[in-house]
Amino acid sequence: MTDIVIKQKDNLHIRVECDDGIAYELSQHFTFDVPGAKYTPQYKARKWDGKIRLFSVSSKTIYVGLKNDVIDFAKKEGYSWECEVEPIDCNLSKQQFTEFTQSLNFHSKNKKIDLRDYQIDSAYDSIKNNRSLILSPTSSGKSAIIASIIRWHTSQDRKCLIIVPTVSLVSQMYSDFADYFSESDWKVNENCYKITSGAPKNNTYPVTISTWQSVYELGAEFFDVFDCVIVDECHLAKAKSITGIMEKVRNAPFRVGCTGTLDGTLTHELVLRGLFGSVYKAVTIKELMDNKQIAGLKVNCLILQYSDNEKQHVKKLDYQQEIDFLVSHQQRNNFIKNLALSRKSNTLVLFNLVERHGKPLYELINSSADDGRKVFLVHGGVDADEREQIRFITETERDAIIIASYGVFSTGVSIRNLHNVIFASPSKSRVRNLQSIGRGLRNSDNKEHCNLYDISDDLSWKSKKNFTLEHAVERIKIYASEGFTYKMIKVNVTNGK
């Protein structure tokens, strides 16, 4: 008798037929601690142990995407196994799909473009295997990959749901599709519907684009019409919201997740692989740079130096108090102002706190800018259509400054004509930093490389390092691991008088 038999339960789950002893082993194998769980009310009230269990002992089910992990478990533990789960045969060869993408007549900025090999390969893998977790870095053209996927499925009379993390990205995805197919009979306004705040929840178009916040609380009947679901920037989703939506899209055998990185994800990699399938590594940032498909990057780590009195003051502060000290430091803000104004070409200044840092920086920079130089402030409170308009304006400007919140501009927002990026606020998140860097890596006709100015603050006193300096060390480790060229420059904060 076979120890483990894997069968299809539905489009989201497989059933593992095995005895109870093996079921408990599988449960342990697919259990992990949730980062930060100990800070949640449920954990503190002892109503939850802070773990996620992906294998259900009672129903003996687990996500379809972890099928290969179950097989690996069986092999490792010496159990005999059978798998009766097979993807839907799309009867599509790689050559046929390549020819199909060529027939779509992709354009960008009114110029005909050909999809790169890794874009075609990524899209084809998701169709052939019915599901895929596409790992493709910022500036690699994920929207073109998604466009080719939805064009194939809609050509087969399948409806597609695209889920993105922000309202800005709903507008941008829609605009990208309009750009790609501007010379095609396939018109975006006839085939795609945007769900934004206050808009009717329409699912009658071939393609629906929405944030997960806009559809999370809708009933399963809204999702029943979709055959394919694609989640962009899926690393940003919290486990509860993303699994809730994916469980409602019960009639969709085709499931695709796109992400630029799996390091430090809010949703554990096992959950993402379970929901979307095996990881498909499309390309690396280094490969894109080596092939001149994205701009080069020069990282300047600017380490601000402070007086002994300030260092002794900060050593007594907790993390939040240190942040408060930095964002209200007039000389530091003046330094950021002078740096932004002295840069040539378009510059993006990224901050964390809107009221206490973003708005003061905007007022400081805008009041000192030369007449005619455009300075924009972008944050979550700015209307999505206005943000999209600012993005388009910047594409045609040569010397604009965008002061933007990390939350809005660190993810997905595409500006080709961007030459300088300034990190005005500290962060150690690998995901956020790489996504933010990506804002400046897109190629344009007048750019060979992007300059990143990473501002950090050395407020260490004797052997005690301040919190944000430790974050800076983590960012430098990221630059080294990605193979970026960087240099470290000490600057006296009084230079920002």
Listing of model-derived features with the role each one plays in the protein:
Residues 439-473:
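Conserved segment of the helicase C-terminal RecA-like domain
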Residues 87-135:
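Conserved pre-motif I regulatory segment
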Residues 171, 191-202, 359-360, 373-410:
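Conserved helicase ATPase core of P-loop NTP-dependent helicases/translocases
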Residues 224-227, 404, 413-426, 435, ...:
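A short beta-strand element within the Helicase C-terminal
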